[in-house]
């Protein structure tokens, strides 16, 4: 049986802005102590101000794989346990297929896949001791649709979904659930600004979205809260589209 959501400890990577911040905000509103990991200290400071006393922010580059075990060790020592891990941190690169270098591809895979594997492995060690835990990975509709100029990003998000299913099967007997959210077009400050500067592209995006609008970041926060919390106690290995109907086909 899962403990009350209100007594849980959560980590949200890439949680200082956009979707990650919306997830952290939802957790804090549900009285979950939330550790936000990010690289931009100014954004982390702003997130701390917004989220308040139930939030701890940590400036950390997840590409530093060798430092992740020590980071998680210190957090476990401080909080005794980690109940929830949201793997949201990731980067994108928009380039023509033939312009993507090996270094470009490796950087995307390293950040979006390898770092998720490493931090998940370290957090799971503690979850196994506690015989409970929930991991929510963030992928993208790009993993399921052929979108142009994002070959490395699409490949990385497909890998995340495959890892989600493999982890769910292996970790379920240990009391750990692993699920994934595949966002569609979400109106973060960055994406909304980009689309507003490209009216033709924005119209194309909206026309292919059955609900006819961009999703609010809070919709991903709601989905993450559901999958991470006790209401989803019998759900694991799921990739949940939150995309305004894009996945209908």
Predicted regions and their residues:
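Substrate-binding pocket helix/loop in short-chain dehydrogenase/reductase
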Residues: 96-97, 101-109, 205
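Alpha-helical segment proximal to the catalytic Tyr-Lys
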Residues: 125, 169-173, 233
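Conserved glycine-rich cofactor-binding loop
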Residues: 16-17
